[in-house]
Regions:
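Small-residue-rich hydrophobic transmembrane alpha-helices
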Residues: 43-106, 139-158, 263-327, 359-380
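Small-residue hotspots at the loop-to-helix junctions and early N-terminal turns
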Residues: 40-51, 126-129, 188, 258-273, ...
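Transmembrane helical elements of multi-pass membrane transporters/channels
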Residues: 12-31, 131, 135, 142, ...
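Alpha-helical transmembrane segments of multipass membrane proteins
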Residues: 29, 33, 110, 144-148, ...
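Short alpha-helical transmembrane segments in multi-pass integral membrane proteins
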Residues: 1-14, 71-137, 168-172, 177-233, ...
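Helix-terminus/linker motif at the lipid-water interface of multi-pass membrane proteins
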Residues: 22, 26-44, 112-119, 175-182, ...
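N-terminal transmembrane alpha-helices
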Residues: 2-33, 37-38, 51-66, 70, ...
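Small-residue-enriched core segments of transmembrane alpha-helices in multipass membrane transport
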Residues: 162-169, 269-272, 349, 382-391
Length: 437
């Protein structure tokens, strides 16, 4: 297959995945927009609570992502029975990992007094976190289902389930927040119910996938579970390192003030929306790299990775231009609080700077996942974010008195360091034959 053919296949796979990721992000934007009408403390509470939720749950997400490379490579080699068995073992991993994560979520608000947050913000964080903690279970199961379907090239049900969840979440937000007057807790409840509905919506699509009869497919397979966890736990660490640094910056912004924490949420919500496109491209790149490796074609895997990186670059450069020119209107779509807008608009200008780095690191991480290399993304994120980015963020935000804007300049530097490391690793790895996992 030539470059043009690979690009067509990649974009055909990425398109529905992008819509699915964007729909998921629209859920968060819906939560933010509706909670934003409750005031800065409520918005700050959801900002910190979201950071806690995603830091905890994304470790499980990374563990579940350990099934992506084995499934894609199995399908590339024509091993549909093995791919189906990996699905069910992935669901087992999702359920097993989610239980301790729910406990961690339940206990997390107890450490808020040591985080330096205001009393009103701490109350909102606790209410939101406790209301949303059970969402970890359907969130992880859904991602196991999605990994199998996207590797199989079946993406339409992912989009349909996401749209259904988006509509249900919006209705649930209005009902629980305003009709029942549950405040930020209502938003957490709505998200949990919407995620559960999305799992149920994908079940028929899973059952309809063509696979040879296999009465053993749902039986516990220790070897496959071990493979998923071996690849998944570094993925989990990588996701926690990445999401955790943004959550940490959210907490640090909260120490500056409620307006800064709320502005961080507004800016990260908008930046995450564009990031969804590169997540979709990265997921498609992971599948294509895995298919080529399963078929024994390392050259094809390298080409798929490079085409994915190029596609992400084009989009993120366009997104950067939009962020530069439309920041006031974008921020105003999520909040009408003048103090929040005054901080959010400069943050969006910084976000425009790191769009390219953010897109490249996400796509490179996807290519490495497809190649079965979970360790490079972990090390790159630990060094880039925690050794380089966060210290610079603290220095600029507090010692140089640049506030939330200084914190975000540190994030930008960290993302750039991660992108450079991951691209370099993929170029080195794909220059030689890659073994299947």
């Amino acid at each position: 297959m030539d470059d043009a053919g690979e690009l067509r296949v990649l974009l055909r796979l990425a398109g529905p995945l992008i819509l699915g990721y964007a729909g998921s992000q629209l859920m968060s934007m819906t939560d933010t927009a509706m909670v934003g009408r409750l005031g800065a403390d409520a918005l700050a509470g959801v900002s910190v609570g979201n950071g806690v939720y995603f830091t905890v749950s994304c470790f499980g997400l990374g563990c579940v992502a350990g099934m992506e490379a084995p499934i894609a490579q199995a399908l590339g080699a024509g091993e549909r029975v093995r791919a189906r068995r990996l699905l069910w073992q992935g669901v087992r991993v999702a359920l097993g990992v989610s239980l301790p994560l729910v406990v961690i979520m339940a206990l997390s608000p107890l450490v808020l007094p040591w985080a330096g947050l205001g009393a009103a913000t701490s109350r909102e964080v606790g209410a939101y976190t406790w209301a949303r903690m059970l969402n970890v279970v359907p969130f992880l199961v859904y991602n196991a289902q999605r990994s199998y379907l996207q590797a199989s090239g079946i993406t339409r049900p992912i989009v349909i389930s996401t749209v259904a969840g988006l509509i249900g979440n919006a209705i649930g937000n209005y009902f629980f927040i305003y009709t029942l007057r549950l405040g930020v807790a209502g938003s957490g409840i709505a998200s949990t119910l919407a995620s559960t509905a999305m799992v149920l919506a994908l079940a028929p699509a899973i059952a309809a996938v063509d696979a040879p009869p296999d009465p053993e497919r749902r039986r516990f397979d220790r070897a496959l579970v071990r493979t998923i966890l071996r690849l998944g736990h570094p993925n989990g660490g990588q996701v926690v390192a990445e999401v955790g640094v943004f959550a940490t910056v959210g907490v640090l912004a909260g120490r500056i003030g409620a307006a800064s924490a709320a502005a961080h949420l507004v800016a990260i919500t908008l930046a995450s929306f564009t990031f969804c496109v590169t997540l979709g491209i990265g997921a498609a790149t992971s599948v294509r790299v895995g298919h080529h490796i399963g078929a024994g074609a390392t050259d094809g895997a390298r080409r798929a990775g490079l085409i994915g990186l190029g596609s992400s670059s084009v989009f993120m450069l366009a997104a950067a231009l939009v962020f530069f020119t439309c920041a006031p209107w974008l921020a105003a779509a999520l909040t009408n609080d003048a103090s929040v807008l005054a901080v959010a608009i400069p943050l969006l200008h910084v976000a425009a700077i790191f769009q390219l780095s953010d897109g490249l690191q996400a796509t490179a991480a996807g290519a490495l996942r497809g190649a079965g290399d979970p360790h490079a993304p972990l090390y790159a994120n630990l060094v880039g974010h925690w050794v380089i980015g966060l210290p610079v963020a603290v220095a600029l935000g507090f010692f140089a008195h640049q506030g939330a804007v200084g914190l975000w300049w540190g994030l930008s530097l960290g993302l750039t360091a991660v992108a450079v490391g991951l691209i370099g690793r993929f170029l080195w790895l794909s220059a030689r034959p890659i073994r299947r996992v």
